[in-house]
């Protein structure tokens, strides 16, 4: 089994990485950061997001597993005191692969039709660079839906619906559903300006195209990466053809993750 371990970079996570690598030597597992079969994230959910983007070019060949060294994270299956058991499971069993939908974002520019493509595991958030009101036309399935005015828009995946989307009042969507969710960030609604004012859940075969009305620089935050874009003509969102693969060695149902992350106390776990 070829593996690689990515850490948060703090002393606790780095120490746990070295401990795991020593265990793995006993099982003759091969460290291979270029072509791993399994990527182990040690840290928090942010570390797993970084791991996802580092290996997003080979998603069909790699599976991810999270070990959390802080508070319980949403993508975590394992805690530090369980790593020896995890390594035994990796070595001795064929792991189950659970696939989650991803979000595809295509940025198109006014410069000769140039475009860039991104994948998001959690969400893509759009705001203006200078903090002014974002004014965009929202088109669904090729038809104009609304002109949005407000602080921004958040488009999330089902697994990402538990992150920023939840804080914005969006719905929680089970990741077995191939969908994306569009949630408003402080929209302007009065007698003159009007938006739908509710999160929109779109199925896989629907495309959302957003076109800036003004020529403001757009600040796009895709998961943990924030990039400013100039001369944006449109931003296209849809459920990606690719999926992220997680290695499962024991049951950890989605709704239990939600319960453990947002409802139960440490004493109840």
UniProtKB/Swiss-Prot annotation:
One of its GO terms (biological process) is NADP biosynthetic process. The keyword Ligase does not apply. One of its GO terms (molecular function) is NAD+ kinase activity. NAD(+) binds at residues 45-46, 122-123, 149, 151, 186. GO terms for cellular component: cytoplasm. The active site is at residue 45. It comes from the Bacteria. Pfam families: NAD_kinase, NAD_kinase_C. The keyword Transmembrane helix does not apply. Keywords: ATP-binding, Cytoplasm, Kinase, NAD, NADP, Nucleotide-binding, Transferase. Involved in the regulation of the intracellular balance of NAD and NADP, and is a key enzyme in the biosynthesis of NADP. Catalyzes specifically the phosphorylation on 2'-hydroxyl of the adenosine moiety of NAD to yield NADP. Belongs to the NAD kinase family. This is NAD kinase. It comes from Staphylococcus aureus (strain NCTC 8325 / PS 47). The gene is nadK.
């Amino acid at each position: 089994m070829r593996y690689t371990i990515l850490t948060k970079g703090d002393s606790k996570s780095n120490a746990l990485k070295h401990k795991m690598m020593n265990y793995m030597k006993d099982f003759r597992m091969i460290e291979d950061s270029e072509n791993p079969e399994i990527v182990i994230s040690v840290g928090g959910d942010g570390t797993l997001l970084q791991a996802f983007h580092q290996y997003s070019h080979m998603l069909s060949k790699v599976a991810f597993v999270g070990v959390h060294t802080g508070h319980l994270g949403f993508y975590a299956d394992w805690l530090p005191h369980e790593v020896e058991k995890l390594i035994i499971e990796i070595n001795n069993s064929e792991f189950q692969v659970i696939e989650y939908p991803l979000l595809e974002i295509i940025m198109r520019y006014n410069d000769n039709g140039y475009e860039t493509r991104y994948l998001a595991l959690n969400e893509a958030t759009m705001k203006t660079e200078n903090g002014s009101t974002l004014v965009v036309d929202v088109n669904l399935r090729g038809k104009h839906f609304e002109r949005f005015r407000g602080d921004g828009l958040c488009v999330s995946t089902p697994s990402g619906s538990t992150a920023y989307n939840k804080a914005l009042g969006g719905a929680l969507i089970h990741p077995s559903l191939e969908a994306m969710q569009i949630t408003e960030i402080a929209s302007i609604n009065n007698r003159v300006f009007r938006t739908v004012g509710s999160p929109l859940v779109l199925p896989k075969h629907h495309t959302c195209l957003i076109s800036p009305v003004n020529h403001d620089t757009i600040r796009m935050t895709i998961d943990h990466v924030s990039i400013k874009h100039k001369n944006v003509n449109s931003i296209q969102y849809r459920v990606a053809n690719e999926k992220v693969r997680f290695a499962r060695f024991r049951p950890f149902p989605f709704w239990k993750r939600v319960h453990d992350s947002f409802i139960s106390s440490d004493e109840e776990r």
